[in-house]
Amino acid sequence: MVSKRQRVLLEVIQELINNNIRSRVYLFKSLFLLDKEYGLNIGFDFHPYKFGPYSIVIDREINKLIKNNYIRKEGNFYKVNKCGKLSNDSIKQIINKFKSQRQILEYVYENYPFFASRSEKIARKKEQIKKGLFDIGYEKKSIDLFISLLLINNINCLIDVRYNAFSMNFDYTKKKLKKYLNDRGVEYLHLKELGINGSLRKSLELEEDYKLLFKNYKKSLKYKQELLNIVISKSKEEGTAIMCFEKDNKFCHRGVIAKELTRQGIGVTAI
């Protein structure tokens, strides 16, 4: 059985084929506009990449559809093996709105300039490097939303302060995350020594448990100034973010790091 977003994906691919359009670029831009302008909330986030708005998750869903024989590769596009009747008129409207791939690209680039900021199709202006320090948690964030937040805040270096750079969401495992970021011009650093060993987190239940853990962690930071200096140095060179899991930094040791760096005169902005 296909999910709601897989169903929409199938229908968009089929409607493109019906209109003799076989273009991945057109596919991604159509899905982007369905979300932004037609309110078709299908659970995809986007970030700026080589040809405008792109989604890692969409490509993953396409691969699932291929694996389950709903679609198959045909040249540079796809052939639909299984698809029901078109269930949303918005899909037909968005595809019929543009006469060519160039037209839909120009429309997206003009109306959503942030998503065109990394495009290979337009000349990129040399931007002044923006410096500063941020903190971010990836909890409940798709990898596409996470990357988008980094780029919109002009972050060029991500410092991972997890003890173990592993996640049940495999997009945030060290190897994958580093590749995603490097491909988009963002440096990745893993400062394991600024993390907290997972064994110390096992019994955390109450707010008091967190307070005790972070109280002890704060004491340990006086022995880790060399590592903090790396963070400080990076933030003075370019936009830099420290990252861990928790959405709210009050429940994450990166919040303790942020407070310590603020005490040392380095402002930290939470994303």
Name each model-derived stretch:
Residues 1-139, 152, 262-263, 267:
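Domain-edge interaction signal
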Residues 50-54, 164-174, 195-197, 246-253:
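Acidic, metal-coordinating catalytic cores used for nucleic-acid/nucleotide bond scission
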Residues 139-143, 170, 220-228:
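A conditional alpha-helix N-cap/helix-loop micro-motif detector
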Residues 157-164, 239-247:
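Acidic beta-strand-to-loop metal/phosphate-binding motif
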Residues 157-167, 190-194, 270-271:
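A short beta-strand-loop structural module common to alpha/beta enzyme folds
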Residues 168-208:
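Short, surface-exposed acidic-centric catalytic microdomains
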Residues 206-241, 251:
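Internal catalytic-core helix/loop-beta-alpha segment
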Residues 251-262:
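Short Gly/Thr/Asp-enriched flexible loops that form oxyanion-binding sites at enzyme active sites
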